Design a protein with these regions (language model features):
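Conserved ABC ATPase signature
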Residues: 91-95, 99
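ABC ATPase nucleotide-binding domains
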Residues: 177-210
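Catalytic Walker B motif of ABC-type/P-loop ATPase nucleotide-binding domains
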Residues: 116-120
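Helix-to-loop junction immediately C-terminal to a conserved catalytic motif
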Residues: 8
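Conserved catalytic loops of ABC-family nucleotide-binding domains
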Residues: 136-148, 152
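Conserved ABC transporter NBD signature motif
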Residues: 16-32
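Conserved ABC ATPase "signature" region
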Residues: 54, 68-87
Length: 210
């Protein structure tokens, strides 16, 4: 979470710098969507699903101006992608945890970010919705890069393209694999990977100072 806040500019780094690159060239910033770990929305606040998703475009709207037709259309497209069309006019206080998660994800992608940052996105989503949630992320990943923080390694293992381990120091493993032994070290207990079909097998280089 701290690393994500540094990337987002919410916290200054103690040392080092954050650089953004686009097509191999350093750029001053990128369009970033963010889904925080904890849901800070007051569910008693009288706001609808559509209004929450629309709020993700607030930075694009000039002060005292209405949203354009194209922006409103974009909101409707996101509602469709999230499967929220039938809930668009419903107050957020009436939603389940999985439904609210989809609303917040919709808000984070409606601005069409170049990078989507998710902090423990399945922390308050029930298991029945989790599979569908990751299918949504796979679809979003076709248009946006995704940085996902999760302690649930088993869930994301088959989906991620690169792994970064953070324990005081950041260890980055591009295109790497994870072994059962590595998982066992991180969970402090023996781990056995079980799955149907092609099982992802990943082996990471040993971290220094471990």
């Amino acid at each position: 979470t701290t690393l994500l806040k540094v990337i987002l500019g919410l916290l200054p780094p103690v040392s080092g710098t954050i650089r953004f690159y686009e097509d191999g060239q350093m750029v001053p910033s990128l369009r970033i969507g963010y889904l925080p770990q904890l849901n800070n929305i007051d569910k008693k606040f009288p706001i609808s699903v559509r209004e929450v998703v629309t709020s993700g475009l607030a930075s694009e709207k000039p002060l005292f101006r209405s949203y354009s037709a194209s922006q409103k259309q974009r909101v409707e497209e996101v509602l469709g992608k999230m499967g929220l069309e039938d809930l668009a006019g419903r107050a957020i206080g009436e939603l389940s945890g999985g439904q609210l998660q989809r609303v917040l994800l919709g808000r984070s992608i409606v601005s069409r970010p170049q990078v989507l940052i998710l902090d423990e996105p399945n922390s308050y989503v029930d298991k029945r919705f989790e599979s569908h949630f990751y299918k949504l992320l796979d679809e979003i990943n076709k248009e946006s890069a995704i940085i996902l923080v999760s302690h649930d390694i088993g869930t994301v293992l088959a989906m991620v393209k690169n792994i970064a381990c953070v324990n005081e120091t950041l260890h980055y493993h591009p295109g790497a694999d994870v072994s059962e032994e590595w998982l066992g070290e991180k969970y402090a207990c023996p781990i056995e990977l079980i799955g149907h079909g092609d099982l992802p097998h990943r082996v990471l280089k040993k971290h220094e100072h471990e």
